[in-house]
Amino acid sequence: MKANLPTSEYPRVVVVGGGFGGITLAEKLAKQPFQVVMLDRHNYHTFQPLLYQVATGGLEPDSIAFPLRKMFGNQKNFHFRMTRVDRVDTDKQEVITTLGPISYDYLVLATGSSTNFFGNKEIEENANGMKSVPEALDLRSLILQNFEQTHETDNISERDLLMDFVVVGGGPTGVEMAGALAELKLHVLPHDYPELDFNLMNIHLVEGGSRLLAGMVERSSLDAQKALEKLGVDIHFNERVTEFSGRE
């Protein structure tokens, strides 16, 4: 396979990553004398702030995934290739991809971030992250599987485990996820699973610091805390998760 990129009289800017940074740069270069080549493993941009809605069933994936080619369809100097970048050869000014080497005059690495497990391999292996549509769908499936399995057991301890949810991190995503789970508990799941007692469902939000939304003003932190507590979320401050076996 080859990238089959057209030649251009303009310098080539290769942008690795179709996230917020990559698409913002590509938009700014729309009418500039550059050939813009965007590379990404997926052919869509994910609006990550709403992944929690996909994970909890509030939105379908196509509501937050936008085709990159369509986004730049009117930009003649833009070219997209779906590929994985394995390494960069700075001497030859090439990125080595699954489509072969792609030369560049300017290279921008906008690959985004990954879930920070703080070096804890056990948690990394057993916990669920939420940085992509597939991960959000995995979470949705796991949530629903838990309630299906709750139907199938008479073991009280097992039932308690299946109906307990722990969200780690009191930043925007953690707060939104905990709130969405609480809304599910109150308004959605009792209708879908009328045989289950949702008073047994517990939602915990664990935050290593002394308040939620630490990057925001304190008023926002207090408002978020009050809203979650009103929804029945148990918030644990100044605590860190040190072990997770996949069950406890």
Language model features with spans:
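Short glycine-enriched, charge-decorated loop/helix-capping segments at active-site entrances
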Residues: L51-G57, E124-N128, R219-S220
